[in-house]
């Protein structure tokens, strides 16, 4: 069953390779959530202010991986960044992504 889904939707994103190639992890949770635990080296830009930070993120010129608690807010942030022409991936939960890298 899972091999069928992989064939249908393609292979998953290789987040480890993206990070090794220089991708930036942006954690879009609140500062309080971020302080409670986060991926080492990630940047905290809450989803409610990410629109204001688009120009600065774009200037970095690197792919972005967004994370949050469950994947919902990181999905919203992905949409904002993608519409600005930034190469972006939704890493989902910060805890889940941390276990993949």
Residue ranges and their predicted role:
Residues 2-21, 31-63, 72-101:
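Rhodanese-like catalytic fold shared by cysteine-dependent sulfurtransferases
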Residues 24-28:
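Short hydrophobic beta-strand that contains or immediately precedes a catalytic carboxylate
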Residues 68:
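Short cysteine clusters
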């Amino acid at each position: 069953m899972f091999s069928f889904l992989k064939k249908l939707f393609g292979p998953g994103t290789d987040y480890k390779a993206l990070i090794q190639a220089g991708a930036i992890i942006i954690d879009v949770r609140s500062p309080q959530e971020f302080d409670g635990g986060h991926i080492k080296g990630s940047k905290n830009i809450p989803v409610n202010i990410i629109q204001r930070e688009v120009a600065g993120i774009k200037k970095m010129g690197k792919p972005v991986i967004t994370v949050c608690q469950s994947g919902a807010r990181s999905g919203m942030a992905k949409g904002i960044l993608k519409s600005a022409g930034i190469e972006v991936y939704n890493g989902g939960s910060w805890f889940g992504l941390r276990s993949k890298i």
